[in-house]
Amino acid sequence: MRIPNPTLKDIAAEVGVSISTVSRALADHPAIPQKTKQRVLKAAQKLNYRPNAQARALRNSKTNTIGLVIPNLFNPYFAELAAAVQNAAIDAGLYTLLGISNDDPKGLIQAVEIMQHQRVDGIIAVPHIGTEKELTALAKQNVPLVLVDRELDIVPATSVSTDPAEGIKAAVSMLVTGGHESIGYLAGPQDTSTGVDRLEAFRSACGSFGIDQYPMLLGGYVEEQGYVGTQELLKLGVSAIIAGDSMMTVGALRACHEHRLTPGFDIALVGFDDFPVFQLQNPPLTIINQHVSTMGAKAFEELHKLLRGDSAQHKIKLPTTLIVRGSTPPKDSASDSPGQGGH
């Protein structure tokens, strides 16, 4: 009859050795003979023994758990980021405790406090303006900390984010070369480093092509802001739109659909982040790709270095690339659609 929750004592009784011998055998202690270790492991497997992670953490002062704080899970970008971090952690034999900040400074601070109470070994967080003081204090307590996706320059911690300049410049270049003179931009929130950096990259790209007038709408990283912003840009008569975020891209698609405009025929549209839903559009959407899975894996790699004693701080910027598909034809060919809004 199988014991419901076997303990070290049960294994010791099964093998006929002391509890301390079982404990050291499971820890692969060099003083325990290999034959005894094999007997203990066989008994543990037979009894379906599972070590108590909390008890082991109290002994070792480590929980083998990292914390990950992201704004939300409904944005596929953050869902993919979380999956990448967790998969990398699993490969390293670590657990991941997930916290949701709801893109609110108080939510981020609360999530970090909970993780500290749970004694996580280190934290990866998507930061928010208004949390500089708390994150700086965390870093100064020598808590291994990596900021991902966004930066807070005054926080003394490693950060992993993307440089939007290359991808956005390639998008503007493609549109200008294709004859688009009125390019609208859906800008993200200016209280995030990503929103600021992407807007600056767009302005710089336009300037490099001699464009000093460009329609632009500021909004949040939510579908509704992309929807409303696209409606306003369409009123201004733009022939092309670049969305500064994945959720804003979804909103832009919804607005185009309601106006019976098909990206690739009636208007050129460049989205952000390469998610399957954008590839399934007809025609598929041209995308500025951040390679989010690579970013998540890199963030964990940097945290893992800190957990192993590397105290060096790094500011890592990963490149963005443009994936050209059917939603951004030259201006003249876009006007040759088989019928306004006929798709």
Regions found by a protein language model. Name each.
Residues 55, 109-112, 135, 172, ...:
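Short hydrophobic/charged patches on amphipathic alpha-helices used for structural packing
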